[in-house]
């Protein structure tokens, strides 16, 4: 399978060198890095080229790398049932960059792009209805960004007495611990009760 994917990667590089920044086969999967400006063209090529025929959009997601200048990777997964192959496209963007919508090529991208917008705050130009899909309309922030607080900003619950949904500030039962996820982990400097070793 890896040979077939390498062959496909070479074919794509020959046919669409203008779109591809780099490609590799890792863990039996073909990964292609594409510039945002060439994304729609390249996705259309993947669908229509007789050697590719990637007619099924499986998923769109994103990955947050806060330490990088190009903070987000928008990741597209496609399937060719005709060739029995999968491909992953990655588009790297800065926090305030926008990604062109592929809904004209794959209408099924509509809700995927809305989900990425809702969870990461990434905007898609040309999207027919870019609004939140999973969180409430008044929701503040983007929950899958690494700088989003683990507790969130508000607590949402149904109040039986008022017979409606109420929003309240988050109240934690235990003290909130702030973790620095951006620094390498060095281990805890303290011993919790029950962690001490018994003298034998």
From Swiss-Prot:
Pfam families: Complex1_30kDa (PF00329). NDH-1 shuttles electrons from NADH, via FMN and iron-sulfur (Fe-S) centers, to quinones in the respiratory chain. The immediate electron acceptor for the enzyme in this species is believed to be ubiquinone. Couples the redox reaction to proton translocation (for every two electrons transferred, four hydrogen ions are translocated across the cytoplasmic membrane), and thus conserves the redox energy in a proton gradient. One of its GO terms (cellular component) is plasma membrane. PANTHER family: NADH DEHYDROGENASE [UBIQUINONE] IRON-SULFUR PROTEIN 3, MITOCHONDRIAL, NADH DEHYDROGENASE UBIQUINONE IRON-SULFUR PROTEIN 3. It comes from the Bacteria. The gene is nuoC. Its EC number is 7.1.1.-. It is a peripheral membrane protein. The keyword Transmembrane helix does not apply. It comes from Ruegeria pomeroyi (strain ATCC 700808 / DSM 15171 / DSS-3) (Silicibacter pomeroyi). It is found in: Cell inner membrane. InterPro entries: NADH_DH_suC (IPR010218), NADH_quin_OxRdtase_su_C/D-like (IPR037232), NADH_UbQ_OxRdtase_30kDa_su (IPR001268), NADH_UbQ_OxRdtase_CS (IPR020396). NDH-1 is composed of 14 different subunits. Subunits NuoB, C, D, E, F, and G constitute the peripheral sector of the complex. It catalyses: a quinone + NADH + 5 H(+)(in) = a quinol + NAD(+) + 4 H(+)(out). Belongs to the complex I 30 kDa subunit family. This is NADH-quinone oxidoreductase subunit C. HAMAP family: NDH1_NuoC. Keywords: Cell inner membrane, Cell membrane, Membrane, NAD, Quinone, Translocase, Transport, Ubiquinone. One of its GO terms (molecular function) is quinone binding. PROSITE patterns: COMPLEX1_30K (PS00542).
């Amino acid at each position: 399978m890896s040979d077939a994917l390498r062959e496909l990667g070479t074919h794509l590089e020959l046919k669409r060198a203008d779109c591809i920044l780099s490609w590799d086969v890792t863990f039996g999967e073909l990964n292609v890095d594409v510039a945002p400006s060439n994304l729609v063209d390249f996705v259309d090529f993947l669908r229509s080229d007789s050697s590719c025929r990637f007619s099924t959009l499986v998923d769109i997601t994103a990955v947050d790398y806060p330490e990088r200048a190009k903070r987000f990777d928008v990741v597209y997964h496609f399937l060719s049932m005709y060739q029995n192959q999968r491909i992953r496209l990655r588009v790297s963007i800065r926090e305030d960059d926008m990604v062109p919508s592929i809904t004209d090529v794959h209408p099924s991208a509509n809700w995927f792009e809305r989900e990425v917008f809702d969870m990461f705050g990434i905007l898609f130009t040309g999207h027919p209805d870019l609004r939140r899909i999973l969180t409430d309309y008044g929701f503040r922030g983007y929950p899958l960004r690494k700088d989003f607080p683990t507790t969130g900003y508000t607590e949402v619950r149904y109040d039986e007495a008022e017979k409606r949904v109420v929003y309240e500030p988050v109240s934690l039962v235990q003290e909130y611990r702030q973790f620095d996820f951006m620094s390498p982990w060095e281990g805890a400097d303290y011993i919790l009760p029950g962690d001490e070793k018994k003298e034998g």
